[in-house]
Regions:
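Short amphipathic helix-loop junctions that connect adjacent transmembrane helices
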Residues: 24-58, 265-282
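Central cavity-lining transmembrane alpha-helices of secondary-active solute carriers
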Residues: 26, 30, 55-81, 102, ...
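Cytoplasmic membrane-interface "Motif A"-like loop-to-helix N-cap segments
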Residues: 83-99
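C-terminal ends and interior cores of transmembrane alpha-helices
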Residues: 73, 94-113
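Cytoplasmic helix-loop-helix junction between adjacent transmembrane helices
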Residues: 121, 125-158
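Juxtamembrane intracellular "pre-TM" segments in multi-pass secondary transporters
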Residues: 1-10, 213-251, 274
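Glycine-rich segments within core transmembrane alpha-helices of 12-TM secondary carriers
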Residues: 153-175
Length: 283
C-alpha cells in the first residue's frame, strides 16, 4: 500500500529538502545581496536601466517579485484544478521543478551588466518554485491518511530547514574562502553558489520523482479542468462567509504572512542602504 509507506513519505519530504535551498539562498540570504552589489555603480548610484527604463535597483527587484507573486495568484487556481482533476501531478511537478532550478543556475551568468536577464531569471525561479509546490502538496492525500497530514507536513518542513541550512553553510564557506576553492574573487564564488542551488534542487528531486506514485487518469486538460480550481475557491469563499471568526483569522493571517515575507525579502536591502551593514553581516 502506497499510503503510509515510509519510503514514499520520506521521498515526498525530500522535495522540501531539495527546493528549500531556493527560499534560503536565492530569495533571502545571498542573491539579494549579490544583486544589490552588482547593480550599484562605482559612484554609489542605485539607478539601473531595465529595457530602457531608469529605476532604482531595489525597487526593480521588489516590483519583479511582486509581479511573480501576482502572476502566481492568477495561475495557482488553474494549477490546483489540474492537480486535483487530472493524474499528471508528477509531470507538472517535474516541469516546474526544472523551470525553477534551471532559472537558479542561469543566475550564474548575471553580472550586473545584463539586469534584464537577472530579473527574468529570478521571476522564473519564483514561478518554478511556487508552481511546483502546488503539485507537491497535492500528493499528500495520495501517500498518507488524513490523520497523518500534520505529522508528515511537519517532517517535510524539518527536511527543508535542515537541507537548506546545510547548503547555505556550504555556500558561505565557498564565498568567504573563495581563494581556497580556486575562485579569483568573492563575486565569482557567489555566482557559483547559484549553480549549486540549481544542482541541489534537481539532484534531490529525483528521489521524489522516482518514488511518488503516477496515477494518470487519462483526462484531457479542458476548459472545465482549467476553471476547476477557481470554482472550488468560490465554493470555499461562499462557505466561510458564514463563519465570522474564520474570516477574521484568514484575513489576519494574510496580512501577517505578507508582512513576514516582505521583511524576509527586503531585509537585506534595508540593512545595506539604511544601516550600511557590511555584506558579511547581511548574510
Amino acid at each position: 500500500d502506497i499510503k503510509s509507506s515510509n519510503k514514499v513519505i520520506n521521498a515526498w519530504c525530500m522535495y522540501d529538502w531539495a527546493n528549500s535551498v531556493y527560499s534560503l539562498v536565492i530569495t533571502t540570504a545571498i542573491f539579494p545581496i549579490y544583486y544589490n552589489a552588482v547593480t550599484t555603480s562605482s559612484t554609489g548610484s542605485y539607478i539601473v536601466s531595465f529595457f530602457g527604463i531608469e529605476i532604482v535597483n531595489s525597487v526593480l527587484y521588489s516590483y519583479s517579485l511582486s509581479f511573480s507573486f501576482l502572476l502566481l495568484t492568477v495561475i495557482q487556481p488553474i494549477l490546483s484544478g489540474i492537480a486535483d482533476y487530472s493524474g499528471n501531478k508528477k509531470l507538472f511537478l517535474r516541469l516546474f521543478m526544472y523551470l525553477g532550478s534551471a532559472s537558479c543556475m542561469s543566475l550564474y551568468f548575471f553580472d550586473g551588466n545584463n539586469v534584464e536577464f537577472g530579473i527574468i531569471c529570478s521571476v522564473f525561479a519564483s514561478i518554478g518554485f511556487t508552481g511546483s509546490l502546488v503539485f507537491y502538496n497535492a500528493f499528500l492525500p495520495e501517500i498518507s491518511s488524513e490523520k497523518d497530514f500534520d505529522k508528515i507536513s511537519a517532517r517535510g518542513y524539518s527536511f527543508g530547514y535542515v537541507g537548506s541550512v546545510i547548503l547555505l553553510i556550504i555556500c558561505l564557506i565557498i564565498i568567504q574562502k573563495f581563494d581556497v576553492f580556486g575562485f579569483p574573487d568573492s563575486q565569482s564564488a557567489t555566482k557559483f553558489t547559484f549553480l549549486l542551488v540549481g544542482i541541489w534542487w534537481i539532484s534531490f528531486s529525483q528521489l521524489t520523482l522516482y518514488y511518488l506514485p503516477q496515477k494518470n487518469k487519462g483526462i484531457k486538460i479542458t476548459l472545465d479542468v482549467l476553471t476547476y480550481g477557481t470554482k472550488e475557491l468560490i465554493k470555499v469563499w461562499n462557505y466561510i462567509k458564514n463563519f465570522k471568526n474564520l474570516k477574521l483569522y484568514l484575513f489576519s493571517y494574510f496580512f501577517y504572512s505578507m508582512g513576514v515575507q516582505t521583511i524576509m525579502l527586503i531585509a537585506s536591502y534595508f540593512g545595506d542602504k539604511e544601516l550600511n551593514l557590511d555584506q558579511s553581516k547581511l548574510i
